């Protein structure tokens, strides 16, 4: 295992870099490691990023300064992209990258085969929230995992107690409202997948709250899904004590100033924790953090769930520092009453000064807001000051009294940040110890040793002479050997193993130092040099093809058909008991076989559903939650004890849980597993899954390519659904319809109200809660692949699924009738498409399968 992943190693500060300036800012301000993306296959497509051609220079820059470099390769990779991905990976290995951050499990397989020595870090896009899932990816060769941001300190403690996997935790930066790797909003609404680095940030848009069909007034809280930013510098000490290996700052799309300020802050916090010293961020430090980028700060989920605190909802963008409110207009400016948080503040810290940029917040951040540069500041009282502006910069007559004043730019901070990295240097060097050995009349050897114990040496043939006047002293040796400018090293210890009367010329010592240090640097680079198996992808593809043509995988129960049976099947997922009754009744009218899956809000009703279905002689499957946290195994136990014929697996922890049990039910992989290529599909088939649902990120051509390279008959393709867009720990029901922090005191408004979120176009997106109190926002428009079903059948697919949301029993039967005709070959799909367009008030969309 790489020393970058050792669980006993010193905790690491990991900073982001979207460009060269941010890279320098991170290094100069104390980062131990930097993560960044290349021009493709990274989850921040809009960042400047680096090219593959630049990567050797990037890694040389970092390694010369004793900093590690991790390449973010954290998107799903489609089948037709695997060849390009393999080429990128070879370049990454050859450039000396210290690790790759990966989402796609198929890509993990490829890396382990292509470059076994390259460390793989599991991206937060893997949605790892429970020890079983973490152990699953460890078995695949992942050497570190980046935990989901929705975990609390207690969750992390439980995980750390049950796995030896090194853990990485986000401690600062933007928070996604949805679980990373589980957000399909951008894909559903615009074909720009967050799993492909193209998030459209729909969570930062305004929404109206529709409760039981009526508009619910939310005041100035329009941004119902826009979380505040994470800032956990106060929690570094307990996280260090939990054994967290790496502290991660979000921000590859942010400025170098932000990277510099955040890195400084967390460097100080980590160092204080390691020294067992208390850490309190100064007032200036807090202002600097807020000024560099802030939508308001929160400890996120690290301190536990608080639905009243996570989303403030007034604005979706960085505001900077809140100065106060406008209380008076003057002939040339305004009078501001300072915000209460500045009471009793350090007078040496200037809150507002000439040259600062401000904006006036009247509660409409989506509109053009007034603002400008401050020309003069005059104190009126301890709590009030007058700000004046240049002529024409601010239309004072239009300013409303009571509006909030934010400082959006601080030139002094920008200058300080730029100075911190402007010299393009870093004090961060690695210690080197020297042993100088020799005998009179013999050779003189200098051995250099780094902090890992790696050594290199240089030798002078001598002969080593006896000093006539000035024998070599330790002081002289340290002076000559300490001349390490221009190298990544700084002098540690020096030990002399020489006769006391020996003399060595300074020129000889200098030459030995240069050669030993050069050799040590070369030895370090040699360790980073890794074997690349160029045929890895071809080998894996041959294995996948062999698996696809191997003996069929029978269903695990009598209720499931064997994969040898070519007859198409139509499955249905229901979300209410009424829909289940309708589906069971409908199955009595059709010759098509298939499973009915239950995805109920309350898993306690699963046993009732199983009994009902079995009483009517029909097989049934039960869906797990998409997320499983430590301590939630009881939810899986209820599913296991319900006696279903199949379980719809939606996370790796659930897969591992059911693999530990006797094989009583078929385990069918659902869409949250993000299967986007034949390598990941084959991985899950090898884990014993008879069927898989492909990723919703695939369009038709991409899906067809994966079907061609796999056993197409083992894919279950969802052909009708309301796309699940946001899947989030944040509960809108609790936040907006109660005063409760979490499920213990919210009063469960989700049981009493039907809620939707309405966007600026008038589209209303249904909201649902699950047993874990996690919310899913669904697309308002159903997605239909009816027209694609004949093509899928022609390519060997035979399992199709219809998912219901709020359909009535009558609508359920009618919908299943239409799709049954297409699956049975009685309709080309076009007629069904036209019928759905007519009968659905909002129509239907071809959605993700539509070619871009």
Feature-to-residue mapping (PLM):
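Conserved phosphate-binding/catalytic loop of the ribokinase/pfkB sugar-kinase fold
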Residues: 126-130
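Conserved non-cysteine loop/helix-boundary elements of the Radical SAM core domain that shape
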Residues: 45-49
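Surface-exposed amphipathic alpha-helical tracts and adjacent flexible/coil segments at the periphery
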Residues: 1-28, 33-43, 58-59, 65-72, ...
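Glycine-rich, highly charged phosphate/nucleotide-binding loops
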Residues: 50-55
């Amino acid at each position: 295992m790489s020393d970058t992943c050792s669980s006993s190693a010193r905790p690491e500060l990991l900073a982001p870099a979207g460009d060269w300036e941010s890279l320098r800012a991170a290094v100069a301000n104390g980062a131990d490691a930097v993560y960044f993306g290349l021009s493709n296959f990274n989850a921040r497509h809009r960042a400047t990023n680096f090219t593959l051609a630049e990567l050797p220079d990037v890694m040389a820059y970092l390694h010369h300064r004793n900093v590690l470099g991790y390449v973010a390769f954290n998107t799903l990779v489609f089948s037709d992209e695997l060849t390009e991905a393999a080429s990128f990976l070879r370049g990454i290995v050859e450039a000396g990258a210290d690790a790759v951050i990966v989402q796609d499990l198929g890509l993990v397989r490829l890396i382990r085969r292509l470059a076994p020595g390259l460390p793989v870090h599991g991206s937060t896009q893997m949605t790892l929230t429970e020890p079983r899932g973490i152990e699953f990816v460890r078995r695949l060769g992942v050497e570190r995992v980046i935990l989901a941001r929705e975990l609390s300190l207690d969750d992390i403690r439980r995980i750390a107690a049950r796995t030896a996997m090194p853990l990485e935790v986000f401690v600062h930066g933007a928070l996604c409202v949805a679980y990373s790797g589980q957000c399909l909003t951008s894909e559903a609404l615009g074909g720009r997948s967050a799993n492909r680095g193209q998030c459209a940030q729909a969570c930062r848009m305004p929404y109206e709250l529709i409760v039981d069909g009526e508009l619910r007034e939310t005041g100035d809280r329009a941004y119902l899904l826009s979380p505040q930013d994470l800032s956990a510098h106060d929690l570094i000490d307990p996280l260090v004590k939990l054994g967290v290996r790496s502290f991660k700052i979000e921000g590859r799309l942010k400025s170098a100033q932000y990277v510099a300020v955040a890195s400084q802050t967390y460097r100080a916090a980590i160092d204080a924790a390691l020294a067992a010293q208390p850490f309190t961020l100064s007032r200036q430090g807090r202002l600097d953090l807020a000024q560099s980028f802030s939508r308001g700060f929160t400890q996120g989920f690290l301190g536990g769930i608080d639905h009243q605190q996570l989303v403030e909802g007034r604005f979706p963008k960085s505001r900077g520092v809140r100065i106060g409110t406008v209380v008076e207009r003057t002939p040339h400016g305004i009078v501001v009453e300072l915000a209460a948080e500045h009471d009793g503040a350090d007078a040496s810290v200037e809150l507002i000064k000439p040259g600062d940029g401000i904006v006036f917040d009247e509660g409409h951040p989506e509109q053009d807001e007034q603002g400008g540069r401050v020309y003069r500041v005059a104190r009126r009282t301890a709590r009030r000051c007058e700000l004046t502006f240049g002529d024409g910069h601010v239309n004072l007559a239009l300013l409303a009294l009571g509006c909030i004043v934010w400082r959006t730019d601080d030139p002094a901070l920008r200058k300080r940040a730029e100075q911190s990295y402007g010299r393009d240097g870093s004090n961060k060097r690695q210690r080197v110890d020297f042993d100088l050995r020799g005998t009179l009349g013999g050779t003189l050897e200098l051995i250099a040793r780094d902090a890992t114990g790696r050594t290199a040496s240089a030798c002078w043939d001598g002969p080593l002479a006896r000093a006539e006047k000035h024998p070599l002293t330790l002081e002289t040796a340290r002076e000559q050997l300490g001349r390490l400018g221009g190298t990544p090293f700084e002098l540690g210890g020096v030990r002399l193993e020489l006769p006391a009367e020996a003399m060595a010329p300074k020129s000889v010592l200098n030459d030995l130092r240069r050669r030993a240090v050069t050799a040590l640097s070369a030895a370090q680079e040699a360790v980073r040099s890794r074997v690349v198996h160029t045929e890895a992808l071809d080998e894996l593809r041959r294995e996948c093809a062999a698996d696809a043509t191997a003996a069929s995988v029978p269903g695990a129960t009598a209720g499931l058909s064997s994969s040898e049976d070519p007859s198409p099947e139509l499955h249905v997922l229901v979300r209410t008991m009424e829909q289940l009754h309708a589906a069971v009744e409908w199955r009595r009218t059709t010759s098509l076989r298939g499973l009915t899956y239950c995805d109920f809000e309350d898993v306690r009703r699963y046993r009732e559903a199983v009994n009902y279905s079995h009483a009517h002689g029909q097989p049934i499957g039960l869906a797990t939650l998409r997320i499983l946290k430590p301590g939630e195994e009881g939810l899986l136990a209820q599913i296991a004890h319900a006696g279903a014929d199949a379980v719809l697996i939606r996370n790796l922890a659930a897969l591992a849980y059911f693999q530990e049990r006797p094989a009583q039910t078929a385990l069918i992989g659902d869409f949250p597993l993000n299967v986007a290529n034949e390598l990941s599909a084959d991985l899950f088939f090898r884990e014993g899954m008879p069927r898989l649902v492909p990723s919703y990120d695939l369009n038709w051509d991409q899906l067809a390519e994966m079907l061609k390279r796999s056993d197409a008959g083992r894919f279950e393709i969802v052909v009708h659904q309301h796309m699940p867009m946001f899947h989030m720990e944040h509960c809108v029901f609790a936040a907006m319809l109660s005063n409760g922090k979490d499920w213990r005191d919210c009063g469960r408004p989700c049981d009493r109200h039907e809620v939707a979120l309405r966007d600026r176009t008038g589209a209303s997106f249904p909201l649902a809660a699950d047993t874990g109190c996690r919310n899913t926002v669904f697309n308002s428009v159903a997605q239909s692949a009816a027209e694609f079903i004949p093509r899928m059948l022609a390519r060997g697919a035979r399992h199709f699924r219809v998912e219901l949301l709020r359909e009535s029993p009558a609508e359920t039967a009618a919908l299943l009738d239409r799709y049954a005709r297409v699956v049975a070959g009685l309709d080309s799909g076009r007629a069904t498409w036209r019928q759905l367009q007519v009968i659905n008030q909002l129509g239907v969309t071809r959605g993700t399968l539509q070619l871009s």
